[in-house]
């Protein structure tokens, strides 16, 4: 009888310990789940800061190279450039780095995609129009919407092989490059228009002298 009571108490102790361990494990797992949400929120916030830095630098650069900047006095332009350079310097002091975990295959796909974009960029000065068309086909390959133009199928398959975060970065880079080309094209047209207007004025002045 005494032996039975001892065995019952031993079994009860084992049950209590097992139940207690399960509770601890459950609490620890719940804590880790909550921490995982905070880690993802941290990465998203850091990525947002990284993107905001890129946007700010692009906007400052755009202002410095705008047509309005060319149509003000030298003194005003110098003062505004000093302010723009100061803002750019302060922006560059913000260092944010969000590392992407990649498999060897994803790493290789990213290198391949980056190399293709770099090759197009290197041809900007030779043929701006063709570079724009090529970039548009690359961008269409990254878009989930129905593309308006041709899609580079080979590039699309390469991008699909990249990590999701890298796919987003590739798309953002292409968007930035296309905006830069558009701004450069506008600047060239404005310059040509200014030259044409100046040439026309000179011609009219010359004709007026002869008359």
Swiss-Prot record:
What are the recorded GO MF terms, alphabetically? adenyl-nucleotide exchange factor activity; protein-folding chaperone binding
Name of protein: BAG family molecular chaperone regulator 2
Q: Which GO terms describe its biological process?
A: protein stabilization
PTM sites of type N-acetylalanine: 2
Occurrences of domain BAG (ranges): 109-189
Recorded coiled-coil stretches: 20-61
InterPro entries in alphabetical order: BAG2 (IPR037689), BAG_domain (IPR003103)
The function of this protein is:
Co-chaperone for HSP70 and HSC70 chaperone proteins. Acts as a nucleotide-exchange factor (NEF) promoting the release of ADP from the HSP70 and HSC70 proteins thereby triggering client/substrate protein release.
Its assembly, as annotated, is: Binds to the ATPase domain of HSP/HSC70 chaperones. May interact with NWD1. Interacts with HSPA1A (via NBD), HSPA1B (via NBD) and HSPA8. May interact with DNJC9; the interaction seems to be histone-dependent.
For the modification Phosphoserine, the affected residues are: 20, 31, 73
* UniProt keywords, alphabetically: Acetylation, Chaperone, Coiled coil, Phosphoprotein
